[in-house]
């Protein structure tokens, strides 16, 4: 006889306050506009809406094709600050707040590193940087799009927590978390220790491998 499960919806609450998010335990991982096509972005986001789970934007920012899908979205912020950057590549609070406060954006994920290329940045080659991608990311069309290996906004755990608090405030108190791969366990330990000492925490942590 199958066991009785009190809650078969398999969801967990992330964040606190009115903008906390009741998140499914199964979601769509980061899939950038630019890495995959507009129809693929919209189809995945529509699936998120139908299935009542979330779709992570990947580092390519929130595009009109995500919005067309209408599904719950996790906006990933990478070292390139795509969608929330100034012309010189620095983080822009005003541009961030404009997108982060959209109803469809449920959580913010700061990408520190990823398992596919731990410790490295990335590049979208110039031929792939179309007008739409350039407008979405806030970059120049037809030029190589560079994701630096590290963030300008922080370089240690204390600065990271300060940045998390900043994004939380700018987004209207939406959940803000981090994504990283565990190249060296002490890196995560130092972040956790800093949170414990400060009594200030990220809302979630995405672990992307242990490379």
Regions found by a protein language model. Name each.
Residues 46, 67-69, 89-211:
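Alpha/beta enzyme core
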């Amino acid at each position: 006889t199958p066991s009785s499960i009190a809650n078969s919806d398999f969801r967990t609450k992330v964040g606190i306050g009115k903008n906390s998010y009741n998140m499914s335990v199964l979601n769509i991982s980061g899939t950038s506009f630019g890495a995959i096509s507009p129809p693929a972005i919209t189809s995945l986001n529509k699936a998120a809406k139908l299935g009542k789970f979330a779709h992570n934007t990947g580092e390519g920012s929130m595009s009109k094709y995500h919005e067309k899908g209408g599904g719950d979205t996790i906006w990933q912020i990478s070292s390139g600050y795509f969608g929330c950057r100034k012309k010189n590549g620095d983080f822009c609070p005003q541009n961030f707040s404009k997108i982060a406060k959209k109803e469809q954006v449920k959580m913010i994920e700061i990408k520190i590193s990823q398992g596919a290329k731990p410790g490295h940045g990335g590049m979208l080659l110039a031929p792939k940087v179309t007008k739409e991608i350039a407008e979405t990311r806030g970059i120049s069309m037809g030029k190589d799009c560079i994701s630096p290996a590290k963030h300008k906004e922080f370089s240690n755990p204390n600065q990271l927590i300060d940045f998390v608090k900043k994004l939380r405030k700018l987004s209207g108190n939406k959940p803000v978390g981090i994504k990283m791969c565990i190249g060296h366990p002490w890196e995560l330990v130092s972040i956790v220790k800093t949170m414990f000492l400060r009594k200030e925490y990220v809302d979630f942590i995405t672990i992307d491998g242990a490379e």
